[in-house]
Regions:
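Secondary-structure edge/capping motif, primarily at the C-terminal ends of alpha-helices
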Residues: 95-96, 123-133, 186-193
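Hydrophobic alpha-helical connector segments
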Residues: 79, 93-121, 175-179, 202, ...
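Short hydrophobic clusters on alpha-helical segments that form packing/core surfaces
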Residues: 30, 34-42, 50, 84, ...
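Helix-turn-helix
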Residues: 33, 41-75, 79, 83
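Amphipathic, non-transmembrane alpha-helical scaffold segments
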Residues: 27, 31, 77, 81, ...
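Amphipathic alpha-helical packing segments from all-alpha helical-bundle domains
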Residues: 89, 136-164, 173-178, 185-188
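C-terminal peripheral helix-coil segments that are non-catalytic and often amphipathic
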Residues: 1-18, 148, 152, 156-163, ...
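Amphipathic alpha-helical segments used for helix-helix packing
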Residues: 116-138, 155, 222-226
Length: 238
């Protein structure tokens, strides 16, 4: 239980002066507390269980404190997914660093497939990813910023590879969406049929996506023959 917040907030919005109350500026610490509480609800019970009242109860904050940091529940939900995406991007970029564009794209694919195959990553991100995917149908505007963030490093490498001539003439944004669709389909299939061989799925998905980008067969073979990458985040949620 967060016992220090009521003391911090006892003057919330109460800097009185002639003409009324002066609005306080957002506090990054309180913003983080609200976001953390909301993320825990979404992660454990889903978006439908999230409410402003529940967040205020768990954080011991008042209504003014909430609306000083978020305009609405929808903005809070969008912020939860964006925060999750930013943490995921840190992990993906670690995997993609010091690689040429072809290997970086393969590393992004491999990193996202960790949702299905890496127990520690899956335990932290699976529920949030499922919730985000569900919201793509119910309320796409809430998760669009999060998806753009997760796709950003992939789009950057696709753009670079296109400029260097390592890919065929491609539309990086469109190809990133297509690659994400292939990866997510295989993640869901593995969750439904867990006996499938992870190594074979990784190889097949990477090969399929790289072929679609126009990568030469010998370059694909070289990528697939590389030793398994060191996976930052194994044994942790990041």
């Amino acid at each position: 239980m967060i016992t220090w917040l009521p003391t911090m907030l006892q003057h919330d919005g109460a800097d009185a002066h002639a003409g009324g109350r002066r609005k306080l500026e957002p506090d990054p610490h309180i913003h983080a507390v609200i976001l953390s509480a909301a993320a825990e609800v979404v992660r454990t019970e889903g978006v439908q269980a999230l409410s402003i009242a529940r967040v205020l109860s768990s954080t011991q904050l008042g209504t003014r404190a909430f609306y000083r940091h978020f305009e609405s529940k929808d903005q809070l939900v969008a912020s939860v997914f964006l925060e999750m995406a930013r943490a995921e991007v840190v992990r993906l970029e670690q995997r993609m660093s010091d690689s040429d564009p072809v290997r970086a794209v393969a590393a992004w694919i491999d990193g996202r497939l960790d949702l299905a195959f890496n127990q520690q990553v899956r335990s932290d991100l699976r529920q949030m990813s499922l919730e985000a995917q569900n919201q793509m149908v119910a309320a796409p505007e809430l998760v669009a910023p999060a998806y753009r963030e997760i796709l950003r490093p992939l789009v950057e490498q696709l753009t670079l590879g296109n400029d260097l001539g390592e890919f065929a003439e491609i539309d990086p944004d469109g190809e990133a969406l297509s690659i994400h669709g292939v990866v997510w389909t295989n993640i869901e299939r593995h969750w439904g049929i867990a006996q499938r061989d992870p190594a074979e799925i990784r190889r097949r998905v990477q090969s399929f996506c790289l072929r679609g980008l126009g990568v030469a067969p010998e370059a694909i073979a070289a990528v697939l023959s590389d030793p398994p990458p060191n996976r930052p985040g194994r044994g942790s949620s990041r």
